[in-house]
C-alpha cells in the first residue's frame, strides 16, 4: 500500500497541515520540538486508532481547541481510498471511504504498518507488558478474531478480578469459562507468531548488526507450544481452580496470557543483562523488520508502512548504514531526523519535509 497524502487539523502543535508523500522515502527533518514525531503520531493514529505516545485523545488536541481531525488518502491493491479520524470532547468518529466504523477493531489492518521509536529499546529492557503489546498489535492487524478474543478476555479478567476482591464465588465460574476460551486462542496465536518471527528476526539481526550471534525468541506461558486450543483451555481451567483461594486473598488473577512474556536472548544470554545498547537496539530493529515481513506475508502481498522516529539514535555508523540499506526493500518509509542530508547517498525516490512549515 502507499500513503499518498495526510491532512491534520488542530493535532498537537499543528493548526493545519497537508502533506503529499513519496511512494518510497519520506524524510521529515528539522530541530527538536517542531513536530516531526507528531506527523508519525498522526499516521499511527490512522493505523491502529491511537498514538504511540499516549492513549488519551485529549492530549492530542491543539491547545485552546476542542477537537482534532486527520484524513489520509492512500492506495491499497491499486485502489485509492480515504480514511478520516476525528475526536471532539468525548466523541470519536472514524470514516473509511464513506462508511462510519463503529469500533477501533474495524480500523485495524486498513493501513498496516510498523514504527520504531527511541523508547523501543524498552521492548527488550522493560516490562513484559511491552512485549505482550508488541505481539498483540501485530497480530491484531491481520487477525480480527484475535481482537475479538483480546477484548473478550480483558472484559472477563476485569470481572473475575472484581469478584475476587469482593470474595464472591457465586458467578465466578461463568467468567472463568469465558476467560479460558479466549485465553487459549490468544496463547496459541502468540506461539504461532513467535515461531514465524524467530527465523526472520535472526536473519535481520545479522543483517542489521553484522554479528553472527544467535538471536532467540521464547514465549513463556503456563501452556506449551505443542498443545491444542482445547488442551490449553483445560490447563487454564485447572490452574484457575488451583489458585482461586490464594487469588481471593490478593484480589487478582495470577496466571493467563496477561501474565505471559516474550524472552529474548543473544547467544543464549538474556539480552536485558548481557547485551550492549547497540546490540539491544539492533535486536529491537530486527524484531520490527520481522514484524513488517509478517504483516506483508499475511496482508495479501501488500507492503505495510515503515516508520522510524529519530533514525540512527544511539547507533554507530556501521549499524546506521546497515539499517538504511534494509529500508530500501520495505516499500514506503517515513523517517524523522535533525539531519537533512541523511538520505543524500540513497538513490531512490525521496521527498524531504523541512520543519517548521505550519505557521
Swiss-Prot record:
An example of a Pfam family matching this protein is SMC_N
| Gene Ontology annotations of biological process type | DNA replication; DNA synthesis involved in DNA repair; double-strand break repair; SOS response
Which cysteine pairs are joined by S-S bonds?
none
- UniProt signal peptide: none
What is the name of the protein in this document?
Answer: DNA replication and repair protein RecF
- The UniProt record gives the binding positions of ATP as 30-37
| Location(s) in or outside the cell | Cytoplasm
MF terms in GO: ATP binding; single-stranded DNA binding
Q: Which NCBIfam families match?
A: recf (TIGR00611)
Source species, please?
A: Protochlamydia amoebophila (strain UWE25)
List the InterPro entries: DNA-binding_RecF, DNA-binding_RecF_CS, P-loop_NTPase, RecF/RecN/SMC_N, RecF_2
Amino acid at each position: 500500500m502507499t500513503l499518498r497524502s495526510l491532512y491534520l487539523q488542530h493535532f498537537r502543535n499543528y493548526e493545519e497541515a497537508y502533506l503529499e508523500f513519496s511512494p518510497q522515502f519520506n524524510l521529515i527533518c528539522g530541530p527538536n520540538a517542531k513536530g516531526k514525531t507528531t506527523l508519525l503520531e498522526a499516521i499511527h493514529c490512522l493505523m491502529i486508532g491511537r498514538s504511540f505516545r499516549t492513549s488519551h485523545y485529549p492530549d492530542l488536541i491543539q491547545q485552546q481547541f476542542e477537537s482534532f481531525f486527520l484524513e489520509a488518502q492512500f492506495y491499497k491493491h491499486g485502489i485509492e481510498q480515504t480514511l478520516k479520524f476525528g475526536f471532539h470532547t468525548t466523541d470519536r468518529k472514524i470514516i473509511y471511504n464513506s462508511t462510519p466504523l463503529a469500533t477501533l477493531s474495524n480500523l485495524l489492518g486498513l493501513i498496516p504498518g510498523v514504527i520504531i521509536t527511541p523508547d523501543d529499546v524498552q521492548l527488550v529492557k522493560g516490562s513484559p507488558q511491552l512485549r505482550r503489546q508488541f505481539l498483540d498489535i501485530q497480530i491484531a492487524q491481520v487477525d480480527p478474531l484475535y481482537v475479538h478474543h483480546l477484548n473478550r478476555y480483558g472484559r472477563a479478567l476485569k470481572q473475575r478480578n472484581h469478584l475476587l476482591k469482593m470474595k464472591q464465588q457465586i458467578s465466578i465460574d461463568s467468567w472463568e469459562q469465558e476467560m479460558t476460551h479466549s485465553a487459549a486462542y490468544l496463547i496459541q496465536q502468540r506461539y504461532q507468531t513467535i515461531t514465524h518471527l524467530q527465523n526472520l528476526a535472526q536473519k535481520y539481526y545479522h543483517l542489521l548488526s553484522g554479528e553472527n550471534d544467535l538471536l532467540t525468541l521464547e514465549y513463556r506461558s503456563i501452556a506449551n507450544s505443542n498443545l491444542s486450543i482445547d488442551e490449553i483451555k483445560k490447563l487454564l481451567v485447572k490452574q484457575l481452580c488451583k489458585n482461586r483461594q490464594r487469588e481471593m486473598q490478593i484480589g487478582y488473577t495470577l496466571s493467563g496470557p496477561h501474565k505471559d512474556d516474550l524472552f529474548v536472548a543473544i547467544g543464549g544470554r538474556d539480552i536485558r543483562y548481557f547485551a550492549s545498547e547497540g546490540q539491544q537496539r539492533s535486536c529491537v530493529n530486527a524484531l520490527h523488520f520481522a514484524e513488517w515481513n509478517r504483516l506483508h506475508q499475511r496482508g495479501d502481498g501488500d507492503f505495510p508502512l515503515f516508520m522510524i522516529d529519530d533514525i540512527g539514535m544511539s547507533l554507530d555508523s556501521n549499524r546506521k548504514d546497515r539499517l538504511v540499506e534494509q529500508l530500501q526493500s520495505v516499500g514506503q518509509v517515513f523517517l524523522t531526523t535533525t539531519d537533512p542530508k541523511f538520505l543524500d547517498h540513497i538513490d531512490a525516490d525521496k521527498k524531504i519535509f523541512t520543519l517548521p512549515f505550519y505557521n
